[in-house]
């Protein structure tokens, strides 16, 4: 194993889980998982929807909406940092158990892109709308608007303008692998996976993308197969980190397919991260990518790459 690959591998702790299911038994209750510490709030919203007889798709949408509404979250929704031109552009996608998908990219002025993505899936013959077309569709469907950037996000952008150094980095959960997650800045994209009481799965991703990105940049989050993939026969996966790297290996799809081939969720994460490290070598030595798979029986794992290797 090369040094780049060796340094890339270890399990990540940042998984928020809400369930009452053993990892070794068939699903008996609804399950919901999402990324990072703030995912606990999303999970609580999803489980509340489930109590009202909501589906897995209802659960992940509800969880995503809660995070999109948080003005203190700088990488999702109304609190998201703007691009280099000072404009907040939002990306989201949803995928249902039967292969139905919907996505929006570079959406502006709309409070809940995850709900717009669902509407694209359910109310149009298309799978993705972008830019002004996505915004026009959202307004036609009477989705709630929002003023963005927030005052704090605009202040951060104006501070960035003083140097305008174009080196956007993901709002990744940790720079040092030993740092425990928990601070409000220790996060990025939220990915959500759920299993309803009917046993069917669904997933969602929502993000404002890289802070101070080039205008028009889209990462992995709204791309089905990269930031999210759901297959009722096997399981589902979501991703976070440097989106360009996730897209290069169709990361979430690759993780699910590795599980289909017999790997455990942990082994599946490892195999895709190893593949990325072999493919890109030193180009990804300072990058972070993370995957969160969940099998259709409810058991899952989390794995990520990191530029810092844990001690032997």
Show which residues each predicted segment covers.
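N-terminal secretory signal peptides and thylakoid transit peptides that target proteins
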Residues: 1-16
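Generic hydrophobic alpha-helical segments
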Residues: 16-17, 70
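C-terminal segment of classical bacterial N-terminal signal peptides
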Residues: 19-22
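Alpha/propeptide regions of enzymes that mature by internal proteolysis
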Residues: 24-312
């Amino acid at each position: 194993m090369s040094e780049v690959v060796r340094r890339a591998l270890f399990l990540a702790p940042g998984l928020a889980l809400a369930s009452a299911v053993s990892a070794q038994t068939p699903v008996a209750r609804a399950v919901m998982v999402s990324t990072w510490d703030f995912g606990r709030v999303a999970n609580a919203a999803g489980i509340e929807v489930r109590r009202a007889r909501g589906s897995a798709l209802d659960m992940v949408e509800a969880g995503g909406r809660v995070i999109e509404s948080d003005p203190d979250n700088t990488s999702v929704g109304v609190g998201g940092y703007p691009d280099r031109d000072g404009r907040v552009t939002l990306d989201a996608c949803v995928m249902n158990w039967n292969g139905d998908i919907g996505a929006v990219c570079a959406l502006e002025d709309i409070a809940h892109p995850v709900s717009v993505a669902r509407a694209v899936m359910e109310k149009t013959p298309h799978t993705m709308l972008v830019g002004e077309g996505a915004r026009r569709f959202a307004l036609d469907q009477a989705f709630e608007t929002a003023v963005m950037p927030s005052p704090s996000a605009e202040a951060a952008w104006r501070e960035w303008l003083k140097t305008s150094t174009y080196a956007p980095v993901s709002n990744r959960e940790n720079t040092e692998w030993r740092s425990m997650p928990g601070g409000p800045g220790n996060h990025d994209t939220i990915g959500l996976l759920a299993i309803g009481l009917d046993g069917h799965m669904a997933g969602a991703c929502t993000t404002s993308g890289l802070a101070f990105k080039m205008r028009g940049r889209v990462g992995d989050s709204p791309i089905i197969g990269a930031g999210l993939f759901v297959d009722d026969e096997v399981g589902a996966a979501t991703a976070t980190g440097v989106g360009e790297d996730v897209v290069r290996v169709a990361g979430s799809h690759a993780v699910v397919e590795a599980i289909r081939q017999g790997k455990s969720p942990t082994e599946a994460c490892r195999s895709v991260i190893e593949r990325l490290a072999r493919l890109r070598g030193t180009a990804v030595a300072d990058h972070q990518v993370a995957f969160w798979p969940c099998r259709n029986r409810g058991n899952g794992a989390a794995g990520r790459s990191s530029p810092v290797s844990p001690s032997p």
